[in-house]
Amino acid sequence: MPSNPKDVLTQGAVKPWHVIFIVLVAYVVGGVAADKLLRAFDSGLRPYVRDGLSVSIAAVIMIAYTLVVPEFRRVLPILFRRARVPVTRTDAGWAFAVALCWGYGLYRAGFCLPALQLKPEWFSVVGLNEAMPDFQFRYLLLLAGPVLLAPLAEELVFRGFLLNLWIARWGVWPAIIASSLFFGAMHWERTLFAGVMGVGFALVYLKYDSLWPGIALHAAYNLLTFYWLLGGLFSIKDRATVQDPSNWIPEIALAILFFPFAWLFWRRFRPGRPAG
């Protein structure tokens, strides 16, 4: 059996557009199903529940397709093998740090703040809230989708299948860019945020030649951004003063840190860097 996932994927009839179709179906069905299931749900809680439920449904659909298609099943042992090189604490730390500095720093200070200064009505669109409900233990169920199912399904489909199929066709960098753009597009209003994250996840996968490190990074980021953890600290803003940069000091500080952190991340994860 070939040891390279792209060789296994290209031996059969599966094409990139097949994967794209599966992803589109999964996300559309997930979104529609979540909206219908939450119609009678408390409107104040609905925004906190909807994304988690939608991504859970989409992830289940993508995983189900994977188990049905023979080419996908055959490549699973290769995609989920042990990392080619050990995952060091330093590498993991820089990867996580640059993800946080992008998601809660440069993306918010460089995109969300200017967008709100132009269009204050986008307050909810960029993921902000004026308050959140008190925490209840049942909300821990909301973590199942973003922390368990989504990292597994999305890394499998976007990095495991699409990235490898496009590497076989176009080469490494066109494949990284194309798979990341599609990953971003499937996150709708957070396209820019997710697209850049997709590049990072792709570099992590290529360094280790295994999906496990990327799944762990993806899951850790999603866990920390839970509304009642770090997410709430950055997502709660006063609508009346949200356009004032003085209310975005933490985001601006993280945005500044993003650049040296991204350089250090690149030094360790750039494609073609010697292993180790």
Give the role of each language-model region:
Residues 1-12:
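Short, Lys/Arg-rich, polar N-terminal cytosolic tail immediately upstream
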Residues 16, 89-93, 139, 169-174, ...:
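Membrane-helix interface segments
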Residues 19-75, 94:
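Alpha-helical transmembrane segments in multi-pass membrane proteins
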Residues 23-32, 56-67, 98-109, 248-270:
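Hydrophobic core of alpha-helical transmembrane segments in multi-pass integral membrane proteins
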Residues 39-49, 77-153, 164, 168, ...:
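Juxtamembrane helix-loop-helix connectors linking adjacent transmembrane helices
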Residues 153-178, 203-210:
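Membrane-interface helix/loop boundary segments of multi-pass membrane proteins
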Residues 178-185, 216, 220:
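Hydrophobic residues within alpha-helical transmembrane segments
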Residues 219-276:
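C-terminal membrane module of polytopic membrane proteins
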